[in-house]
Amino acid sequence: VLDNSPYDGKLILDNTSYNKESWVEWGNLEKAEAIPGSLEFLKYASEKGIEIFYISNRYSEQLEATVNNLKKLGFPNAEKSNVLLREDDRSKSDRRKSVSDYYNVIMLIGDNLADFNDEFEVKLAEERTNYTDQMSDSFGTKLIVLPNPNYGDWESNGLFGGKSYSNQEKDSIRKSNINSY
């Protein structure tokens, strides 16, 4: 629900790639904005009596900053007990189970299929496709996939308009569209 695209913009501008140190630094700034529609949707759910949990692969050392960022934006249930961050394992399975052991989980929202089920973790494309087909009835009801603004088909079909560009031209187009901190 937090838009981390300024972090990716910073990586591009600095001509570097993801690393834990810079990721923690970004999270500790508490400057992420809400993904459009996420705040309104979760407030609506909360008003209807739904308990909200935030399961993220931000690192556990970012808990206080993440909770503060969520609170500043007005997200419901933005408490340490409801924000489940990564320890060592990037899999969200144990964190999802810690919620489902005490709550009836009615919906999962994420920008990565592995946010919903470990069957999607590091699988071949064909396996992921088959599993997606098996779960198709859950998409849009129990499983809500958020668009990921940082990478995916949107780049070739959206940003580049389906046209072919050299790597240098692509870099120039990307940089002209960056939102950074």
Where are these regions (language model features)?
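Alpha-helical substrate-recognition element adjacent to the catalytic core
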Residues: 1-89, 181
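C-terminal cap/substrate-recognition subdomain and adjoining C-terminal extension
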Residues: 59, 63-181
